[in-house]
Design a protein with these regions (language model features):
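PLP-dependent amino-acid enzyme catalytic core
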Residues: 1-485
Length: 485
């Protein structure tokens, strides 16, 4: 749409917006030096268009003025904590703007429509349906790109999310229910869709989400492995809990690079949709929504793993209270740096690590194996949840910390998980029909293509990064903002 594109170019000029490329997100060495020079004066969460260049796993771990490092920020979970001999590395989302990697997925959805003019920043409102972090990322990116935004999320999400959104999003809509009530969010977006000025960026179906994670998160996890591997070690597995399933496409990249790597998808035991078509409410914020996302490449998924939400809640308290940290130091001998890094694990990040432990036990992985995952956000977004746990279970103590570690981490078993045969994968894929064809109006032929035509669907999406980068470079050249910086 040439008119929309022209409006976006003018808006970008007015607001000094430069859009980063996927290549720059993969490799920050490609970011122009004059952008880096300006970033030294910008805070990580500042509403400044330059922070688009911090949609990057390689950010320095600084709240203000940080640049980039060759290896992304990660936490390695020692065997004394995990109870398994293999190495578990978790890449941290805390050092993205908003403290969460969802700014990346939302960028992947918004940028293509912005640089083609399908989204007109002077007319459209960007609608971000989410169970929490994606709408935060979308609202933040919208603000940086000078677009109006509408955030939609369940009413029972953490207090911190709503407080932050009230300052950033143009409009915040709370839908009934908790984490797993995505149907209610979809109903609200369906209603908003009737207004042509509302453009929906649905992370559960937008192919920009897997495009970004495949090309950015997948490459970054590979960078971490290549930096830390010792002679004889192999990248044996990767696990990601599924909210929108965007991160699962990082696993697609890893499976191509490391043949033999097993890819696991995680969900809440209280809502085991993948495992046994189950449903229910749960407390692992950001995942598990009683449906199979359109963008989940189920055919390439090797294992389904269910995590008890009680495990992730109890460990949140272990890692984020003085009593818990004293236990980690005195009893396990963890150093202060690692204890600090364990606060980089939000609730779904903890669940991701637990998936890795269960996978390691199932496949009997050894010290020659490395399993990777990501930490969507950090404990910053869940301080109110820790207070609630104290109210529910009483004051914390070192003995309670020891018990939590024993029961909720060391005590994990290989129950509630399934190594997926072809027919299991097909069953899970078929569940997409009920959400996406019956309720959301997609075509059966498109659903079948996701299963039978890998080359024309998943591979084609993954390969679109170059085309998107060409459009972004053209957009930046036309605005002239980078030249004038």
């Amino acid at each position: 749409n040439k008119t929309g594109l022209q409006h976006n170019i003018e808006k970008a000029k007015e607001n000094n917006v430069i859009i980063p490329t996927i290549a720059q997100m993969q490799n920050p060495d490609l970011i122009p030096e004059k952008v880096k020079a300006k970033l030294t004066g910008v805070g990580l969460w500042d509403v400044n268009p330059l922070n688009l260049f911090r949609i990057n796993w390689h950010n320095e771990a600084k709240e203000f003025g940080g640049l980039y490092q060759s290896v992304p920020n990660y936490v390695e979970i020692p065997s004394s904590l995990s109870g398994v001999p293999c190495r578990i590395v978790a890449m941290a989302g805390k050092w993205f703007p908003t403290g969460c990697h969802k700014v990346g997925a939302s960028f992947g959805c918004l940028a293509p429509r912005l640089v083609t003019g399908q989204f007109d920043a002077t007319y459209h409102h960007a609608v971000w349906p989410s169970t929490g972090n994606y709408c935060r990322g979308g609202a933040f990116n919208s603000k940086l790109l000078a677009c109006d935004s509408v955030a939609i999320l369940p009413a029972e999400m953490s207090k911190e999310r709503f407080e932050w959104l009230s300052k950033i999003a143009g409009q915040v809509i709370a839908t009934p229910g908790c984490e797993s009530n995505v149907k209610e969010i979809f109903d609200k977006t369906w209603e908003l869709k009737q207004d042509p000025a509302m453009m929906i960026f649905n992370q559960f179906e937008e192919m920009g989400n897997p495009l970004w994670h495949y090309n950015v998160t997948g490459y970054a996890l590979s960078d971490v492995f290549e930096a830390i591997k010792k002679p004889g070690q192999r990248f044996a597995g990767a696990c990601f809990t599924s909210g929108s399933a965007g991160t699962m496409s990082a696993g697609d990249l890893l499976k191509e690079r490391y043949p033999g790597l097993k890819l696991g998808v995680g969900e809440a035991l209280q809502c085991p949709t993948i495992l046994d078509n189950g449903f229910g409410g749960h407390r692992i914020e950001g995942i598990g929504d009683k449906h199979i996302p359109w963008i989940h490449n189920v055919k390439n998924t090797d294992m389904a793993i269910a995590i008890d939400d009680e495990d992730s809640q109890r460990l949140l308290r272990l890692f984020n209270t003085p009593e818990g940290q004293k236990y980690l130091k005195d009893e396990l001998g963890l150093d202060d740096e690692l204890i600090e890094k364990l606060t980089w694990l939000g609730i779904s990040g903890i669940a991701n690590v637990l998936c890795c432990i269960k996978m390691a036990k199932y496949y009997e992985l050894t010290e020659n194996d490395v399993v990777g995952t990501v930490l969507t956000d950090s404990a910053v977004m869940y301080q109110s949840r820790i207070e609630e746990l104290n109210e529910m279970h009483g004051a914390y103590s070192e003995s309670a910390a020891a018990l939590d570690h024993q029961l909720h981490m060391l005590g994990l078993k290989t129950d509630s998980m399934l190594e997926l045969r072809y027919t299991d994968r097909k069953r899970i894929h078929n569940l997409k029909y009920y959400t996406w064809v019956e309720q959301q109006g997609k075509e059966v032929s498109d659903l079948n293509a996701l299963w039978y035509n890998t080359k024309g669907t998943w591979d084609a999406v993954h390969a679109q990064a170059k085309e998107l980068d060409d459009l972004i470079n053209e957009f930046n050249d036309t605005t002239g903002v980078l030249k004038a910086l």
